[in-house]
């Protein structure tokens, strides 16, 4: 089937409509939170606050910076491993995230921050919006190289909407805990993306197989994304936790789990290769699995060695998934997972949900202290019949809800994206930047060996024929090529002696 990939009319109109809609909705609904409003000084005076340091901004903004870098730099560069799709990986990730955070601020504002007819906007909102968009970036990895920017915008719109509904039910109605988003961000994002790519299955994708691989420099760029994500993941898992011990504990648990997953990833990567070599795909991705797996239980009393155990197993399962499960799913179940998000986010996300359920179910006042367990899980006087076993069940229900929302939502959105007018590329043109980007090809250069008698002459010339400014090319005698010069001796070659 021939596809029309010229987006000159469709993409600008879509972006313009979406942005104008955002402006109108923000104008109607969004207002500054009191701590971001010019009336903050009156609030300080009323509450007898003497310092601006009490403003929530100073507690939350460092975490926001780290999460923001993960979304735009970490996820963006992690997907630059494809040899001809670097522009699209970073650029389309930038596009969907920029739109997604605006829509997420509205959606989450209506569900969580709606006061007196308006959404109150603070630094906490933008952290939550980045979390929401991180789920969209995860799903993007499954369809990378196979969808148009139009499809990505539509997918982001629906995914942000479904994410917010799922998160509200899970956190506010079921009352599950998910500080680092193993269930709401990673499990939901991964299986939503996998379901979409299953619906969008391309039977002739093998025609683009030569571009569905990396080269030396593209793997290095992807490793930049890995390092950004690895360094900032403790902030990601702790950004929304309560100040104090919970946030402190979340950062420590994530730090340890990430470290453990690196060593087990290297171990398994070497084992599965016949010559014991390491696969860069494993190192770029599976080394991050510990951060995903510890997310739900990050702020719980998981213990340091428990965090190491989680990272240990996440690294193993993630690497084995890249080695064996991804090819199996593509060949047998028509799931074309470009980035292997099932192994980095899906499987570790499920592990994280289970770890959170077990940790919650075995929590006790002996470990947390009586005030600590009330503070961590909300076992208070208003929920006298609530106990740790019920919390464990809530965690499992939350995991199942995320899976169900992802699968059902992915099927619906997948069929919407399958419509033929979104400007998607043909099977033979997938994983190619030049379909949607102006790509300036490099001018190759050739090396002409230096004539030792004329050391001042240049050695690099353009790899194109030299045309002299004459009135007729026919009067220019052909110039014989300069024979190579041996550099083994300082004497000129005999061929150059007249």
Curated annotation (Swiss-Prot):
GO terms for cellular component: apical plasma membrane; basolateral plasma membrane; plasma membrane. Expressed in the forestomach and the fundus of the stomach. Expressed at the level of villous in duodenum, jejunum, ileum and colon. Expressed in kidney by connecting segments and collecting tubules (at protein level). Expressed in testis by seminiferous tubules. Its main location: membrane. The keyword Transport applies. It is a multi-pass membrane protein. One of its GO terms (molecular function) is carbon dioxide transmembrane transporter activity. InterPro entries: Ammonium/urea_transptr, NH4_transpt_AmtB-like_dom, RhesusRHD. Residues 1-9, 83-86, 146-153, 201-219, 273-279, 326-340, 417-498 are cytoplasmic. One of its GO terms (biological process) is transepithelial ammonium transport. Glycans are attached at residue 48. Homotrimer. Belongs to the ammonium transporter (TC 2.A.49) family. Rh subfamily. This is Ammonium transporter Rh type C. It comes from Mus musculus (Mouse). The lineage of its organism: Eukaryota, Metazoa, Chordata, Craniata, Vertebrata.
């Amino acid at each position: 089937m021939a596809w029309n990939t010229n987006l000159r009319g469709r993409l600008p109109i879509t972006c313009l409509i979406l942005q104008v809609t955002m402006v109108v909705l923000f104008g109607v609904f969004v207002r500054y939170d009191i701590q971001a409003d010019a009336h903050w000084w009156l609030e300080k005076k009323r509450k007898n606050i003497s310092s601006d340091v009490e403003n929530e901004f100073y507690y939350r903004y460092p975490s926001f910076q780290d999460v923001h870098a993960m979304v735009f730099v970490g996820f963006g560069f992690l997907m630059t491993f494809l040899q001809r799709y670097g522009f699209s990986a970073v650029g389309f990730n930038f596009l969907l995230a920029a739109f997604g955070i605006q829509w997420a601020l509205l959606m989450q504002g209506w569900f969580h921050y709606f006061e007196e007819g308006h959404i109150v906007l603070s630094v906490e909102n933008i952290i939550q919006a980045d979390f929401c968009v991180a789920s969209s970036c995860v799903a993007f990895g499954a369809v990378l190289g196979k969808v148009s920017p139009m499809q990505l915008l539509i997918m982001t719109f629906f995914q942000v909407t479904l994410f917010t509904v799922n998160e509200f039910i899970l956190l506010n109605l079921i009352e599950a805990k998910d500080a680092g988003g193993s269930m709401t961000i990673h499990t939901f994002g991964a299986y939503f993306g996998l379901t979409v790519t299953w619906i969008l299955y391309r039977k002739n994708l093998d025609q683009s197989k030569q571009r569905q691989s990396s080269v030396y420099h593209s793997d290095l760029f992807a490793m930049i994304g890995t390092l950004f994500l690895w360094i900032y993941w403790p902030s990601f898992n702790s950004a929304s936790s309560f100040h104090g011990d919970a946030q402190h504990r979340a950062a420590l648990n994530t730090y340890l789990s990430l470290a453990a997953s690196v060593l087990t990833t290297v171990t398994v990567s070497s084992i599965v290769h016949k010559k014991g070599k390491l696969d860069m795909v494993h190192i770029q991705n599976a080394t991050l699995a510990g951060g995903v797996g510890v997310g739900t239980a990050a702020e719980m009393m998981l213990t340091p060695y428990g965090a190491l155990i989680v990272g240990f197993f996440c690294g193993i399962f993630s690497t084995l998934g890249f080695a064996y499960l991804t090819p199996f799913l593509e060949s047998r179940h028509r799931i074309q997972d470009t980035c292997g998000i099932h192994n980095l986010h899906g499987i570790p996300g499920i592990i994280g949900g289970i770890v959170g359920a077990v940790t919650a179910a075995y929590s006790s006042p002996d470990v947390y202290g009586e005030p600590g367990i009330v503070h961590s899980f909300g076992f208070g006087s208003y929920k006298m019949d609530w106990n740790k076993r019920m919390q464990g069940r809530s965690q499992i229900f939350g995991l199942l809800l995320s899976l169900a929302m992802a699968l059902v939502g992915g099927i619906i959105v997948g069929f919407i994206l399958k419509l033929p007018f979104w400007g998607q590329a043909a099977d033979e043109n997938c994983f190619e930047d030049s379909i949607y980007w102006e790509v300036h090809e490099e001018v190759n250069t050739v090396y002409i060996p230096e004539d030792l008698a004329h050391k001042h002459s240049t050695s690099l010339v353009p790899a194109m024929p030299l045309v002299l400014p004459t009135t007729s090319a026919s009067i220019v005698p052909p110039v014989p090529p300069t024979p190579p010069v041996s550099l083994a001796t300082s004497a000129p070659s005999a061929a150059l002696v007249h």
